[in-house]
Amino acid sequence: MDIKQIHHVAIICSDYKRSKAFYTELLGFRVIAETYRAERESYKLDLEVGKGHQIELFSFPNPAERPSYPEARGLRHLAFAVPDVEKSVQELQEKGVAVEDIRIDPLTGQKFTFFADPDGLPLELYEEGI
């Protein structure tokens, strides 16, 4: 097996319009493609994150909630590399997003913090190494 990289991360949201606005307008991800599948009553939104990375945002009628606290099995969080965590936190807070206090990774010495998407999915901002 010759795995090169992660191709995409798929997220199922409860409110498509709200989540689309969050990821495109608030976080600034670029829309690659948007498809509505009538037979599934479902949208699929392909978003570009940086260069060569994608998030697929899906909507389904009445998706079941996934427990995430306390530390349920499965995806724990999705992390985004940023050049300046403090600046990114300020931008999010100016847009009304609640952000946890900035912490220092004891293993790398890098700054990081967490916030959540509209469905409560934990998202991390991790400062790129210098």
Language-model-derived ranges and their functions:
Residues 32-33, 40-43, 62-68, 101:
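A short, acidic/glycine-rich surface segment
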Residues 12-53, 94:
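Core segments of cupin and vicinal oxygen chelate
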Residues 59-63, 127-130:
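Acetyl-CoA-dependent GNAT
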